[in-house]
From Swiss-Prot:
Residues where Zn(2+) binds: C38, C41, C56, C59
PANTHER family: 60S RIBOSOMAL PROTEIN L37A, LARGE RIBOSOMAL SUBUNIT PROTEIN EL43
Key word Zinc-finger present: yes
Membrane spanning stretches: none
Keyword Ribosomal protein: yes
Biological process annotations from GO: translation
Gene3D superfamilies hit by this protein: 2.20.25.30
Gene Ontology cellular component list: ribonucleoprotein complex; ribosome
Entries under NCBIfam families matching the protein: eL43_euk_arch, PRK03976.1
GO MF annotations, alphabetized: large ribosomal subunit rRNA binding; structural constituent of ribosome; zinc ion binding
Species annotation: Methanothermobacter thermautotrophicus (strain ATCC 29096 / DSM 1053 / JCM 10044 / NBRC 100330 / Delta H) (Methanobacterium thermoautotrophicum)
The protein's name in its UniProt record: Large ribosomal subunit protein eL43
Zn finger region (C4-type): 38-59
Gene label: rpl37ae
Length: 89
């Protein structure tokens, strides 16, 4: 597969689609494909099953999240607010 140091994972597109689009795709896909921390067992083993569905390879927990990341910025905010309300702080 045609990959280089600069284009990395987007080398598969070759000369098509332009530099800006490929940079955006590269940033999203590299972040998406790395291992994420599981919310159940706190170990790095979460991989993307399909769009918005994530699975931990260590404990087998399956949960929903964002399309490209298991925890979205809005999800973090909501969890923080719920924790604050339930915790009484």
């Amino acid at each position: 597969m045609a990959r280089t140091k600069k284009v990395g994972i987007t080398g598969r597109f070759g000369p098509r689609y332009g530099r800006k689009a490929k940079r955006a795709v590269k940033k999203i896909e590299e972040e998406m494909k790395r291992k994420h921390v599981c919310p159940s067992c706190d170990r790095p083993g979460v991989k993307r099953e399909s769009r918005g569905i994530w699975k931990c390879r260590k404990c087998g927990a399956v949960f929903t999240g964002g399309a490209y990341l298991p925890v979205t910025p809005m999800g973090k905010t909501a969890a923080r607010n719920i924790k604050r309300i339930v915790g009484g702080k």
